[in-house]
């Protein structure tokens, strides 16, 4: 299995933002355990909701929270949706255990993640597929089931090689697992968890790929299927930039996230203007559900760049 990240291009300004944030976060280590625990609880909820919603789960974020915290069912919602939410949250916890125990990547780990994700939903949970499949809407057909084990051997071997750049390696990890499609079902959910497993093993926070970006997500996966991994790499990099920003907002006052409405009141710019610049990627910002947030530090950096331009 060939892996060459020289063809994977990510905007240098975006990479610089991520590297600077990662450096600032690393300079704060060791991070307070209580704060990390709360952060990971939030990521666990949001990852579970969004990863399931991408696959068609009908639970809202608040309903997902209720199911996970109270263990009860939501009237009018399919039982399958409740099982998916509980399974994904449990798989996220298992992923954290693998990170804490410093377990190396292996086929067994990936199969265990799949077993948890599809528990009670798939009779072959945790087992590679024993037949050929087609993916609706995909431009390519997954390889023959007879090649899955050898392809997964190559996949694990490539992951274990030192990454030239974690973001580019994560792009390969995510796409290749979707491409091999080793299981009859649940491949997307497993790929998103395995990507986060890799990131956290490299000292990065987990990322959340959002359901409102579902069309973009499938489009960049389609482009990756056709040999262009750069759009997927940028998509993942933007998610990482946001995750790092969320982490820093907890530990540094100047990085504390506030809504653009509040930020506009502290600046000469309108909320509409700041929102536009956030969408354009000019103002470092994070979108949590339907609301944009940024920080005083990001605003100061934006103003500084504007003066220099």
Task: Describe every region a protein language model picked out.
Residues 1-185, 189-309:
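FIC/Doc superfamily catalytic core
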């Amino acid at each position: 299995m060939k892996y060459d990240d020289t063809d994977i291009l990510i905007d240098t300004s975006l990479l610089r933002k991520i590297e600077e944030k990662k450096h600032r976060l690393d300079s704060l280590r060791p991070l307070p355990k209580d704060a990390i625990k709360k952060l990971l609880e939030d990521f666990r909820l949001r990852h579970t909701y969004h990863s399931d919603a991408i696959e068609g789960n009908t639970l809202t974020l608040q309903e997902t929270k209720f199911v996970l915290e109270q263990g009860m069912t939501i009237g009018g919602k399919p039982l399958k949706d409740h099982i998916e939410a509980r399974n994904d949250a449990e798989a996220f916890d298992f992923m954290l255990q693998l990170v804490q125990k410093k377990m190396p990547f292996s086929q067994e780990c990936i199969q265990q993640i799949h077993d948890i994700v599809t528990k009670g939903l798939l009779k072959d949970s945790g087992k590679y597929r024993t037949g050929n499949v087609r993916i609706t809407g995909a431009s390519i057909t997954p390889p023959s089931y007879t090649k899955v084990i050898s392809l997964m051997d190559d996949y694990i071997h490539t992951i274990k090689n030192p990454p030239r750049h974690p973001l580019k390696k994560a792009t390969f990890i995510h796409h290749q697992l979707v491409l091999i499609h080793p299981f009859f079902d649940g491949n997307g959910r497993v790929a998103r968890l395995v990507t986060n497993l890799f990131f956290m093993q490299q000292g990065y926070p987990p990322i959340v790929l959002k359901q409102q970006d579902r069309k973009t997500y499938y489009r960049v996966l389609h482009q990756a299927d056709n040999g262009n991994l750069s759009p997927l790499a940028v998509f993942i990099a933007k998610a990482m930039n946001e995750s790092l920003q969320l982490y820093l907002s907890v530990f540094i006052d100047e990085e504390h996230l506030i809504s653009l409405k509040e930020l506009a009141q502290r600046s000469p710019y309108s909320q509409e203007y700041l929102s536009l610049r956030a969408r354009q990627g000019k103002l470092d910002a994070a979108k949590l559900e339907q609301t944009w947030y940024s920080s005083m530090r990001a605003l100061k950096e934006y103003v500084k760049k504007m003066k220099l331009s």
